[in-house]
């Protein structure tokens, strides 16, 4: 994989046992709709890797990654419940980069800078393969659900509206 952005090369190098086929879209794939249009797949086959912070009853905060189908919205109350927290909030741009090593809009489902819990919405299973960000807002890669499960090791739950 030559001529990839540094973040995509770093992600590909961090993953073993999976041949990552990164595709670059210079016009960008910032939204699920943009990505689906560029790839030619349903919006539901796009994985949005969202970074949220869950907060427990003592006020302790923990960043988590939530994998959501591109056509659905995260339900923050369901996420909090699944995470054993009292509430959740969207992570700031600085929190996203600190927790994952990637910028918002390009966060991949695995290969993060720090150990971080990952949750995946059950409705991602409607498509196989799915497409996820490869470290930047202009790169994506296809991945089977089996490989996504093996590499991201998510807690599968219903966390969308």
Question: What annotation goes with each model-predicted range?
Answer:
Residues 1-161:
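Extended, low-hydrophobicity, polar/charged segments
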